Each structure stands twice: as C-alpha cells, then as structure tokens.
C-alpha cells in the first residue's frame, strides 16, 4: 500500500519524503490543477527541483492536471502535460477526457491516474477509463461507503486510490455547483472551490463573520474555531434554527479502517492538503507511515495508537475527525 502525500511547495514536498511518503502529488502554478491558490504550487524551475529530490530518494512524483480545459485554452492544458512528462513525472492525475486521450497517445509510458474530479463511482465508469485510456489507477470520490469501496476493488482490474485523511468534501467531486453558484467561477475550470479573492472576514459586534462573495457563511463567537468559508460547511437558518445544515467543519480520518483497506488491496491511501503547511505534511505523513508499517506487520491486531489520533485530531479542521461517507447509513 502506497502512502501518497500532498505538497503545495518544495518545503512541504521534502517534509513528505523525509517523513515516509512513498509518493507525493503536486500541481503546477496555474489553473490546470484543482488547488489553484495564490502562493501555492510549482513553477517549471521548482518542478525540476521537485523531480530531482523525489527521484534521488527513490520515490514517485504525481502531477495533478485535473481541471477541465477551457474552450479557448486547450493548448495550455496540453503544455502542462508536456512539461510534466518531459521533466520526469511518474504519474499524471487527469480528469478531462481529452487530456487523458492526449496523455495516452503522446506519453504512453507515463501512468495515467483518473482524478477524483472525474467522480468515477461505479464499475462501468472505472472500466471505461481503463478500456479507452489504459489508466493505471482511479482515485475514488469521498462519497462511497467502505462496503462500496471493497465491492469496487473486487470487480475492477484497475488499482484504486482512496482519500485517507484531510479536508472532507461531501459532494460528488467535479459535480458540485455551490461555489460556482455563489461566485460565478467553477472549480472545474479555475481550479479552486470558494476562491480566496471572494473570501472576506469581518469582526462585528455579533462575532467574527466569514463571507463568500458578500454572502454570510458563518459567524463565530470568541473561542470558536473559525473554518475556511466553504458553502457546504457554513451555518444556515433552517426552520428558524441556525446550524451546519450540510456538514460540520471536520476532517476525514480513516486510520481505524486501515486493516480493511489493506485487505481490499487498495493501492494507495491519499492525504489531502496541498494547501497546508510543511509542518502539517510532516506530522501527518509520520503518523501514517508508522500506522501503515504497523498494520502490515500485524493486521489482525492493529489498533490506532491514541498518540496518533491526538496528532491527527490537532491537525484537523475544527479539531475533530470523522469517517465521513465510509460509515454513513444514508447509503
């Protein structure tokens, strides 16, 4: 089982490798990836350094080019694939069908991974990508139960990657319109949900308010942990009551499911957080490296250590964690 860690910059990439990541995933410094935030991601020069460092340590580098090409910008997405391939990427994480075809025809020797943004949630969808683009892996969305994940692993020949820890998206990724509705800009094309330029914080007599494109998302009292204003994690008035109507600010943590994921032959567990600090990457990678090694050695008796859970809890949104859809009954 591969431990795949995020990096939004070179220090985070080095922290991931030095703390046990088998592979690191990154994005380029433009809107071809779904974490397009100011100050984040890699220029061509930094990408060269990243490839060199990762390969010196005999690890792998995956590059996310997982937004959807604009009608007048297809050549930019092609150039992103070209640069990633020519500089030595081990895998390309793609969602756009045209980009999958381009990469398969131009660079058949480089692994193609179907991004979570493609939202492949069933056997036929996965096999479609395998049949047409010979993909080496599919990243499953965070809306599937553990039973559904196991079932897919049994029936498809394509290795599967699952999100194991980090920010929790409760929507069918690549198909959510909340951010687009409020800001007029789609995460599928500009590369960011709740883009930072639409975010505003304001201290008021009622508390600290977070707004997205001037729409109130949440209000925090003194001592409350303030989360980034994503619409699905806001507090709203519903039938006269104010609460988290869709999802509370919380992070996914599947550490206790590790034996089941290993038994299902899941190829890779993915840590979310390219927008997070090197310190976050370092601590989370270290915990997951220890846990994977312990589980491999004795899966029958594996129990997450309390110290691991405390560390992950302290790194989590709202300092709380959940199994998310893996154990939700509504499925």
Curated annotation (Swiss-Prot):
Its cofactor is [4Fe-4S] cluster. Disruption phenotype: Deletion mutant is unable to synthesize ubiquinone under strict anaerobic conditions. Mutant shows normal levels of ubiquinone after aerobic growth. Pathway: Cofactor biosynthesis; ubiquinone biosynthesis. It holds the Pfam family Peptidase_U32. SUPFAM superfamilies: Thiamin phosphate synthase. Keywords: 4Fe-4S, Iron, Iron-sulfur, Metal-binding, Ubiquinone biosynthesis. InterPro entries: Peptidase_U32 (IPR001539), RNA/ubiquinone_mod_enzymes (IPR051454), ThiamineP_synth_sf (IPR036206), UbiU (IPR043692). One of its GO terms (molecular function) is metal ion binding. GO terms for biological process: ubiquinone biosynthetic process. Forms a heterodimer with UbiV. HAMAP family: UbiU (MF_02232). This is Ubiquinone biosynthesis protein UbiU. The gene is ubiU.
């Amino acid at each position: 089982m591969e431990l795949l860690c995020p990096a939004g910059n070179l220090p985070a990439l080095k922290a991931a490798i030095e703390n046990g990541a088998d592979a690191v995933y990154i994005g380029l410094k433009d809107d071809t990836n779904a974490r397009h935030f100011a100050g984040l991601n890699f220029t061509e020069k930094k990408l060269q350094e990243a490839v060199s460092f990762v390969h010196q340590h005999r690890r792998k580098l995956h590059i996310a080019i997982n937004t959807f090409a604009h009608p007048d910008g297809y050549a930019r997405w092609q150039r992103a694939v070209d640069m990633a391939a020519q500089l030595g990427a081990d895998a390309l994480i793609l969602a756009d069908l045209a980009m999958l075809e381009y990469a398969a025809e131009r660079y058949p020797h480089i692994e193609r991974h179907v991004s979570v943004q493609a939202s492949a949630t069933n056997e036929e969808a996965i096999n479609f990508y395998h049949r047409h683009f010979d993909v080496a892996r599919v990243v499953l969305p965070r809306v599937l139960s553990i039973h559904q994940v196991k079932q897919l692993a049994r029936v498809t020949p394509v290795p599967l990657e699952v999100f194991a820890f980090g920010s929790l998206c409760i929507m069918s990724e690549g198909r959510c319109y909340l951010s687009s509705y409020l800001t007029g800009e789609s995460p599928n094309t500009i590369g960011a949900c709740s883009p930072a330029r639409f975010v505003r914080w304001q201290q008021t007599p009622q508390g600290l308010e977070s707004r997205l494109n001037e729409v109130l998302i949440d209000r925090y009292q003194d001592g409350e942990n303030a989360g980034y204003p994503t619409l699905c994690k806001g507090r709203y008035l519903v039938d006269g009551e104010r609460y988290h109507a869709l999802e509370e600010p919380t992070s996914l943590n599947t550490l206790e499911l590790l034996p089941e994921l290993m038994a299902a032959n899941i190829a890779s567990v993915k840590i979310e957080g390219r927008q997070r600090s090197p310190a976050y990457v370092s601590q989370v990678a270290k915990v997951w490296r220890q846990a994977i090694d312990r589980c491999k050695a004795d899966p029958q008796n594996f129990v997450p250590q309390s110290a691991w859970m405390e560390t992950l809890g302290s790194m989590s949104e709202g300092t709380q964690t959940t199994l998310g859809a893996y154990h939700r009954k509504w499925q």
